[in-house]
């Protein structure tokens, strides 16, 4: 589903994975950092390069299905996501276990992007275009769709 900081269209608790994309990498990173600080007990995420997910999709699926040794799952952040990941991710994202959060970081994706379309069309996925760096506004809106 398309997420915005102007409000959610559906129940945010259904969202298992969020695609953060925008033209300014610093703004995208800021949104992710702020989101993690409010939505997760873990203030940081385990970063995985998109190229690694593409080259070893089975390893990524295994990582998603492994229970955490700790009480809370550490969010997974896929950095540098592009349309080339769409087919690789479509099935594993539908099988994300309860409590696991998968975030994707990408440069700006056009409305015709297959990855963006995937995240906007599925009810358990969300896409967020990061274009405004206004900290109080961002924090307020992130708090309004806290996944926990």
Question: Predicted segment positions?
Answer:
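Conserved beta/loop motifs at nucleotide-recognition and modification sites
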Residues: 1-148
């Amino acid at each position: 589903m398309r997420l915005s900081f102007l409000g959610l269209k559906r129940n945010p608790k259904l969202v298992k994975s969020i695609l953060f994309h925008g033209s300014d990498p610093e703004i995208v990173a800021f949104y992710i950092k702020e989101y993690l600080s409010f939505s997760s007990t873990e203030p940081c995420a385990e970063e995985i390069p998109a190229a690694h997910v593409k080259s070893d999709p089975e390893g990524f699926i295994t990582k998603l299905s492994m229970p955490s040794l700790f009480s809370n799952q550490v969010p997974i952040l896929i950095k540098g996501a592009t349309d080339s990941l769409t087919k690789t991710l479509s099935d594993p994202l539908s099988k994300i276990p309860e409590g696991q959060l998968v975030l994707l970081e990408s440069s700006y994706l056009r409305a015709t992007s297959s990855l963006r379309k995937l995240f906007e069309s599925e009810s358990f996925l969300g896409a967020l275009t990061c274009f405004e760096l206004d900290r109080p506004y961002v924090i307020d809106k992130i708090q309004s769709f806290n996944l926990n």
